[in-house]
Amino acid sequence: MTRVRRGYIARRRRTKIRLFTSTFRGAHSRLTRTTTQQKMRALVSSHRDRCRQKRDFRRLWITRINAVTRENRVSYSYSRLMHDLYKRQLLLNRKILAQIAISNRNCIYMISNEIIK
C-alpha cells in the first residue's frame, strides 16, 4: 500500500480542541484523548446548566416575593397574591415583582391595595 499524505487536518482539529481546553487543569488540557472527553463533558454541562439557570432564578424570585408578602402581611401567601394579580389583570412578571419587593416595599403595599379594591 502506498503512503497517504494527510496534511494538517488532524493537527488542526487537535489544536482547536486544545484551544478550547487550554484553561483546564492537568492532563485535561494536554492529552488529546482526555481533552476531547472533557470538551464534550463541558459542553454537555453548559447546555444543562443554561436550562437549569432559568429554573433557579424563577425559584429565587418566587422565594423573595413570598418572603416579603408573608413578612409584612401584604397577602396571605405568594399564590394568592399572584392569583389576585391575574384576576385584576395587573400583569407584572416575577422578576420585576422580586426587584420591587427587595428595593421598594412600599410599592408592594400599593400594588396589594390596588388588588383589594
Swiss-Prot record:
GO biological process, alphabetically ordered: ribosomal large subunit assembly; translation
Function: Binds directly to 23S ribosomal RNA and is necessary for the in vitro assembly process of the 50S ribosomal subunit. It is not involved in the protein synthesizing functions of that subunit.
Pfam family, one: Ribosomal_L20
Cited HAMAP family: Ribosomal_bL20
PROSITE patterns linked: RIBOSOMAL_L20
Keyword annotations of the record: Chloroplast, Plastid, Ribonucleoprotein, Ribosomal protein, RNA-binding, rRNA-binding
GO MF term set: rRNA binding; structural constituent of ribosome
Primary residence: plastid
Cellular location(s): Plastid, Chloroplast
GO cellular component terms, semicolon-separated: chloroplast; ribonucleoprotein complex; ribosome
Similarity annotation: Belongs to the bacterial ribosomal protein bL20 family.
Record Gene3D superfamilies: 6.10.160.10, Ribosomal protein L20 (1.10.1900.20)
Keyword Ribonucleoprotein applies: yes
Protein name per Swiss-Prot or TrEMBL: Large ribosomal subunit protein bL20c
NCBIfam families: rplT_bact
